Amino acid sequence: AASDVYKRQAVTFPFRKNESEGTIKYFSLAYPIIDALDNGKRLIIDEFDSKMHPLLTCRIITLFNSKETNPKNAQLIFTTHDTNLLSANIFRRDQIWFTQKDRYGATELYSLAEYKVRNDASFEKDYLSGKYGAIPIVGDLTRLFNTQEK
């Protein structure tokens, strides 16, 4: 009978096994994001951009920056290495903060608002060129591959 052909059976779908780490992270952040927005809370996330698509991180940031979706002024505080987020289209200058280690290893925290920045400046380009500091000291990595003895 036709009904036998289309008989449905429950299928177990192990979410953590079958989904990407980015999808799992997104779903694990969904409730804290909704809770923060609904109740005007602070949400603090380390390595926010890790494992997630850049468009998704921008969408989440937009939720917090919008008066419509964030009428209770919830705050999203996060660390990131995604320089694409350094944009006047996403953040005001006072919303962007940098960290830099001093010579003793203590971390200094400072805002982009402390710098005189032209209205048409590219925050990302200026940051990557070292204009705002907070750039890691990489050094000459080619020495790691020099296997010849002198």
Task: Report each predicted region and the residues it spans.
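Walker B catalytic acidic pair
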Residues: 46-48
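C-terminal lobe/lid and adjacent interdomain/linker elements of RecA-like ASCE P-loop ATPase modules
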Residues: 61-150
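Short, small-residue-biased leader/transition segments that mark boundaries at the very start
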Residues: 1-6
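Conserved D-loop-proximal element of ABC-family nucleotide-binding domains
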Residues: 53-54
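Short, conserved, surface-exposed binding loops centered on an aromatic residue
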Residues: 18, 34-37, 68-70, 88
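GG-anchored amphipathic helix commonly corresponding to the ABC/SMC/Rad50 NBD signature/C-loop
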Residues: 19-43, 59
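Conserved P-loop NTPase mechanochemical-coupling segment
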Residues: 7-18
